[in-house]
Amino acid sequence: MTDAIIQQIEQFHCPRGRLFAERRNRGYTLYDAQSGAPVERMRQVGQQDRFDILYWSLWKERWASTGPFGRTILPINDALQFIAHEDIFWVMT
């Protein structure tokens, strides 16, 4: 069985490079396909196609919210565009 969300992530054309994803602990972890470094973590919110977007904080050494005032929740397509264009997700690649 192939996960439709993983397929959508892996088919996304990211200008920074190809992504691959794996399902873990109620969410998805996205990696840079070239380096294998983690890029982002997405947790599904509710029953809809909306995700809480997290980045790896080198300071906190854990996944952290991207928004200045809390969580950033976006539909999958908007989330992928957001990840592709924000530098905070690419510090470890």
Q: Where do the PLM segments sit?
A:
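Functionally constrained cores in energy, signaling, and assembly domains
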Residues: G17, E40, Q44, D87
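Short, conserved beta-strand/beta-arch hydrophobic-aromatic motifs that form part
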Residues: D32-Y55
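Short linear sequence motifs
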Residues: A21, Q44, Q48-D49, P75, ...
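Intrinsically disordered, low-complexity regions
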Residues: R18, Y28, A37, Q47, ...
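Broad hydrophobic/π-residue packing in well-ordered secondary structure
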Residues: L19, R23, D49-S57, V91-M92
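Mixed-charge, Lys/Arg-enriched low-complexity segments
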Residues: M1-I9, Y55-T93
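Negatively charged, low-complexity tracts enriched in Asp/Glu with abundant Ser/Thr
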Residues: M1-Q34
